[in-house]
């Protein structure tokens, strides 16, 4: 009799353990599906900035990053607190915040030597500083506050893409005024309206493509974003590339700015390769969650490259000024600062359009339910 009872108890225990394992398996599968189940627990309050990927909805996850996620729907204050914690966004926030501070201090030094109120030749440099500062500041903000809600996450990165597009345009403007060939054979470099129109179109198209990639072409979103911004980089820096390729004077062929420009291009190329391939975390998921993931390389290398870009432009601004002032076009408020403002407004309008589209989709989903 005792033997039978023990057998029954053992069988019951085995069945109970199997049922628990089955429920746990179902829980993990539901978590990975991207839908938060009623039983989904975000853990203790001290762990809300270091959650595993299966405890956050799918749209808050990054490929091959397994830990270090913040609890979705946190407040702005909690987002600020998370910047001092060990989460997978910490380095993204601080890398570009430090870069923003560096560019701001350096620009103050440069502009103190070239008063823009008295020197219109400094206008393109101001545009570049505005674009660069906006890019770094919006990047930090997007990575800091993207866990507040699903819609906030999309809007944060919409503005991040817009800031990158404005930066690229401002860089193109500065490269045209400071680094273009002195005697270009290409028609587009002899016509500033044509060049700046192309840069404007590229800015708007790249922003629209990146915003759309958050809802379409999800499987190729990193390639789309990296590809559009790399194309924008080559178009906006084309005055310098053509100048190096077809230099016709000692000033163009032996410019002191060339090493800085080449180094910037190298840093940007490595950053694009890492971001597009998702290396190294693709090879060892979970190892580089806090430090060393591809987006960290993107942030840090782009920051260093942009500093080199700043140096290259400033050296050309100083060394080529006399020759450029004899050319057919020179900077004015209208063709530099005002034009950058127009492009900025156009990019903000695109962001607002995509933001409204999110609201419309949410409303449609609620009506269906």
Describe the function of each predicted region.
Residues 2-369:
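Multi-pass alpha-helical transmembrane bundles in non-GPCR membrane proteins
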């Amino acid at each position: 009799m005792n033997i039978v009872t023990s057998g029954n108890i053992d069988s019951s225990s085995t069945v109970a353990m199997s049922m628990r394992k089955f429920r746990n398996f179902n829980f993990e599968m539901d978590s990975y599906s991207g839908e938060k189940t009623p039983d989904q627990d975000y853990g203790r309050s001290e762990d809300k900035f270091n959650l595993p990927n299966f405890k956050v909805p799918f749209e808050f996850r990054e490929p091959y990053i397994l830990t270090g996620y913040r609890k979705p729907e946190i407040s702005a204050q909690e987002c600020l607190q998370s910047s001092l914690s060990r989460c997978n966004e910490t380095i993204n926030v601080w890398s570009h915040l430090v870069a923003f501070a560096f560019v701001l201090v350096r620009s103050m030094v440069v502009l103190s030597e070239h008063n823009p109120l008295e020197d219109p030749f400094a206008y393109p440099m101001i545009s570049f500083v505005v674009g660069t500062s906006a890019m770094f500041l919006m990047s930090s903000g997007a990575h800091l506050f993207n866990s507040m809600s699903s819609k906030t996450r999309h809007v944060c990165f919409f503005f991040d893409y817009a800031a990158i597009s404005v930066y690229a345009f401002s860089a193109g403007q500065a490269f045209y005024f400071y680094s273009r060939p002195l005697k270009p054979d290409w028609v587009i470099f002899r016509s500033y309206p044509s060049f700046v129109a192309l840069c404007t179109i590229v800015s708007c198209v790249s922003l629209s493509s990146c915003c759309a990639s958050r809802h379409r072409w999800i499987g190729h979103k990193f390639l789309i974003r990296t590809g559009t911004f790399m194309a924008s980089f080559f178009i906006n820096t084309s005055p310098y590339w053509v100048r190096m390729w077809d230099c016709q004077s000692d000033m163009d062929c032996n410019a002191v700015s060339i090493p800085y420009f080449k180094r910037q291009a190298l840093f940007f190329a490595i950053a694009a390769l890492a971001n597009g391939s998702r290396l190294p975390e693709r090879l060892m998921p979970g190892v580089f969650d806090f430090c060393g993931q591809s987006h960290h390389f993107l942030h840090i290398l782009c920051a260093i490259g942009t500093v080199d870009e700043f140096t290259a432009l400033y050296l050309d601004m100083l060394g080529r000024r006399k020759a450029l002032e004899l050319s057919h076009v020179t900077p004015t408020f209208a063709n530099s600062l005002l034009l950058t403002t127009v492009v900025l407004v156009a990019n903000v309008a695109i962001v607002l359009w995509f933001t409204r589209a999110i609201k419309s989709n949410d409303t449609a989903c609620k009506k269906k339910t």
